[in-house]
Each structure stands twice: as C-alpha cells, then as structure tokens.
Amino acid sequence: MIKVKNLNAGYGKLQILFDVNAKIEKGKITTVVGPNGSGKSTFLKTLFGLTKIYSGEIIFKDKDIAKVPPHQKARMKIAYLPQTNNVFANLTVEENLKIAGYVLDKDKVKERIEIALSVFPELKDILKRKAGTLSGGQRQFLAMGMALVRDAEVLMLDEPTAQLSPKLAEVIFEKIIEMRDNFGLTILLVEQNAKRALEISDNGYMFVSGRVAFEGTAEELLNHEKFKEYSLGITAV
C-alpha cells in the first residue's frame, strides 16, 4: 500500500528521520514503536506531508506522493489523526461527521455516517452535542468515525489511547481491529502502550534515533531482545 524509500525528513534544518525504509501493507495494522524522541510521530507526520522532506520517496498506488500537500492526501483517502484529535469543537458531533464527507455526494455521506455509527454506536446518543464538550474517549470515537465517513483507505493514528483509562483504551484497540477486519483499512499506529499495540498488529517497526532499528512481524518484535529491553525501560536500545 505505502512504500517508503530512503526517507530523510525533519523540521526546517533539524533532521529527525534518517534513511528510513518501510512498507505499510494493505489491509494490515502496522505499529511503530521506540523510545521518546525516536521519530515515531514525525514519521506519521511526514507521510501526511506535515514536515520537510530532504530526500526520499513515499510511494502510494505507484505514485511518489512525498511532495503532495496534506489536503490532497486527504482526497487520496489517507487520514491522519494526531493525538489532539481532528474535530471541530464548535460544531456538533453530527456536523463533524457530515463535514468529514465533504468530497462525497449527499447520499454517499449519509451511507458513510451510518457505517461510522455502526462501528461507534457510542456516538448515537450525543449527535447534537458540541464536540468541545466531549470526553477524551468520545472525541477519539468521533475522530475515528470521521475517518470512516471520509471513506479512508489508510488511517494513521498517533497515540489514540493517550490519557485514556485502560478500560477505554482497550475499547479503542477493539475498534481498530474492527476497522481492519470489517473494512479492510490499512492502519499505521503509534502508541504509548507498545506491547498491547503490537499484540493487535500484523507488522511493526522499531525506531531509534530517527532510524529503523529493526522490523518484522508483530510477533517477531514482541520477542526481540531489544524490544524487551525497551519495554522494561532500559535506555540502551
């Protein structure tokens, strides 16, 4: 689905990613793990066009989209959800869902909203509430639901369970699995709870100092000695 080749990127003159090569497989969950400051979130931002790319390629559907701006990537059915959630606080939940389908015709938007509400029934009783009044979990449900309305093919999630209770975080993980299994979404995940994220994933990458330290199936990463050291809080990764 997405192939990253020799990617070097950062912010202005500050380079964060160095010679990154990765393959995000279609219809799979791929999790990126690593210590704080290793470039995980920057990797997602770079794929969506929010950083400066010095060199390298991002191949999507046989085209290099490295220089394509974010609004065009959204039209290409690539969705990026930062930790802060992409919701409009002054609009209702229902209005947010409708806006998410702005590039679709009216009948298609209605159909996609019904699909989103089937995955996130928690939103049904709060459709008339302003998004700014929602809890953290409700905002996350809304942001992910908006991606479904948009009919996204690729969904990039940056720490979707941050500041949520363990119980609610598990609900989010279950929703991610459902979006892959029932709708074939390609999902790229950065998550604080790296172990749990890998447990629901197909593949994974570990970043250290802006480089891919190792990659493999989720099971291979979970059993890798370096990941075990990282999980135990050992800094010498």
UniProtKB/Swiss-Prot annotation:
Q: Which UniProt keywords apply?
A: Amino-acid transport, ATP-binding, Nucleotide-binding, Transport
Which biological process annotations from GO are given for this protein? branched-chain amino acid transport; L-amino acid transport
* Chain residues that bind ATP: 34-41
**Any signal peptide, and if so, which residues?**
none
Start and end residues of each ABC transporter domain: 2-234
Q: Which SMART domains does the record cross-reference, listed alphabetically?
A: AAA
In Gene Ontology terms, what is one molecular function of this protein?
ATP hydrolysis activity
PROSITE patterns registered for this protein in UniProt: ABC_TRANSPORTER_2 (PS50893)
Q: What does this protein do?
A: Probable component of a branched-chain amino-acid transport system.
Its family remark reads: Belongs to the ABC transporter superfamily.
Its protein name is Probable branched-chain amino acid transport ATP-binding protein LivF
The gene from which this protein is expressed is livF
